Amino acid sequence: MEMPDYCDYDGLGLAALVAKKAVTPLELVEAAIERIEQHNPVLNAVVYKGYDDARAWARGDLPDGPFKGVPFLIKDLGMPVAGWPRSHGSKFARGVVDAEDGGLTRRYKAAGVVPVGKTNTPEYGITGTTESAALGPCRNPWNPSHIAGGSSGGAASAVAAGIVPVAHASDGLGSIRIPAACCGLVGLKVTRDRTPNMPDGFDYALGNVVDNVVTRTVRDSAAMLDATGYPEPGSPYPPPPKDRPYLEEITRSPGKLRIAWSWETPNGRPIDPQIQAALERTAALLKGLGHEVIERGLGIDYRALYASRGPAAAANFAAGMGRLIELVGREPEPGELEPLTWATLKAGRRQE
């Protein structure tokens, strides 16, 4: 398959070609690998290349899911893939290799995707830019001198560069939304446990951290959420059931909505003029579509919110690190964790 043709399709489009036998899953995998080798030296979006496994999976009997045969990338953070390393963007975890797939990994594979590698992340995903000491900086394909955002920066960079049409991502305080905005993609933080990583996942940040994907089209995001967003027995936060498939939902008119917007910033600093202009254009567009659009303040004391949330988040992070320390078999040594990670770990242990 010619490279320009590969980039012309979203994930569902590629799966349709596979279904029609116009292309094989192996050909799609080779196209993705070719683009990794072409773009990754500049972008550093893909930090583990699982080419041999991907080729073997593509040659085998793939599940008949909506994304059958579509190349896929998994964020190198909290998402086990059997036989693949999981560094969490940290020097401390570099030797960790998972023995089996995680719960959500199995759901992605059941959707028919073919994982070809893992994507860049900041250390333990705790910053909004992807520049860890262990993995190096990830760059934005629209302008390599710019950041790709974080913590799912590698996923967003790879999708925006046309390496894959859809990639796994996760989000606690913007880790899907920030890189999606930086790279011009669709990025949705879903309700907690809408896509549970159970039964073997860890409840990071009291359900505040969720998994989903970044994509180039809304329909890919909807279809992947349909494929992975179903209840799991034992999940701590079962979400309300959906009314209908998301792929159907995006074709329906929402009717007239009441939409509030604000250009207040959580830290009280002035908003950038370009962002303010974009907000005003968006508000005008929504009003022109018939919605009721209201400008109003956030009504939230963010300083108080962060002050109360910080200790709980740090304690939860320390508990998660405890699981990793048990897996590695020792405590981290000086130089194996970045300063912010050390500080968060120490703060969390004081809460235990």
Where are the model-predicted features located?
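Residue-level signal for inorganic ion chemistry
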Residues: 32, 54, 221, 259, ...
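A short helix-breaking turn/cap at a secondary-structure junction
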Residues: 189-282, 300, 323, 327, ...
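Short glycine/serine-rich loop segments
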Residues: 100-230
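Acidic/His- and Gly-rich active-site-bordering loop/insert found
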Residues: 54-133
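Short helix-loop capping/hinge segments that flank enzyme active sites or metal/cofactor-binding pockets
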Residues: 67-88, 251-263, 312-352
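An N-terminal boundary/leader segment
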Residues: 1-49, 284, 288-290, 346-351
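General small-molecule cofactor/ligand-binding pocket signal
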Residues: 116, 292-297
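Short, well-ordered beta-strand elements within core beta-sheets of diverse protein domains
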Residues: 13-20, 73, 92-96, 209-216, ...
